[in-house]
């Protein structure tokens, strides 16, 4: 199991990437979260697209002095390319609301809800979104045996990119009493959809589902961090090979989640399809989907006729702050 940590960084790193342009975009990336490297790689393609679109671009690797840096450079818009803690969890949108700087991606409540697996689950179920059975386990519970019948999934409360996610199968030599809660004192224990469960991903932009793809695992047992970011570990079947009525239902459910959570800009909804019953189980909605070469939202957007540069332009158009 990988152990990724949040690193406290005192000072932001500011780099001018383009000094002329129609508007000044601060491209926020890196930061202090466990997903720092993913964010930095995502920002590379985004920066090229912004410059191609004619924007003045300043890159900011976010540190604790971010408010001071933003006051100094005075951007017209912040493109939030951060993943994980402080960027994806509602913290940065809260600061930008106070500073009245328009920003891309979802706002405070939407981001915070989506990032926290307990609260997003409550929200989903309240809005009649089907999910697999799950329970919350606290470190202080001192549970010695399996908290749920195997197979089950262990999910950290607030991590992205499948960091810290483990699937415990019946044959695994695993003792829950030895689990050390590496990402906080609470975890979600979720039923693993057995057999022919199919991993489905939907890209949503401005409330409209652009399409869906299916993840076919080639090496690892589940869609973990390594599989997500290593070429050759999974195939993407785009569009997802589903009957027309089921494909349409998948898009409608994704739009419902997006709208009930009041998301903004791009998002990626994740589902498991139980093939024996054709039942869809929602996993989560990601309000800060990756923008890397292997990333799903750009791939689905391309299938829908939106190239990467135009996708970034559409995201910029959604920039606003909450008053």
UniProtKB/Swiss-Prot annotation:
Positions with a binding annotation for Mg(2+) 1? 270, 284
Q: Where is the ATP-grasp domain?
A: 121-317
Q: Report the protein name in the record.
A: D-alanine--D-alanine ligase
**Cofactor: bound how, per the entry note?**
Binds 2 magnesium or manganese ions per subunit.
InterPro entries in UniProt: ATP-grasp, ATP_grasp_subdomain_1, D-Ala_lig_Van_CS, D_ala_D_ala, Dala_Dala_lig_C, Dala_Dala_lig_N, PreATP-grasp_dom_sf
What are the protein's UniProt keywords? ATP-binding, Cell shape, Cell wall biogenesis/degradation, Cytoplasm, Ligase, Magnesium, Manganese, Metal-binding, Nucleotide-binding, Peptidoglycan synthesis
Q: What does this protein do?
A: Cell wall formation.
UniProt keyword annotation of Transmembrane present: no
Broad enzyme group: ligase
Which domain of life does the UniProt lineage start with? Bacteria
Binding residues annotated for Mg(2+) 2, in chain numbering? 284, 286
Q: What does the record give as EC number?
A: 6.3.2.4
Q: Which positions bind ATP?
A: 147-199
Q: One of this protein's GO BP terms?
A: regulation of cell shape
Cofactor(s) for this protein?
Answer: Mg(2+); Mn(2+)
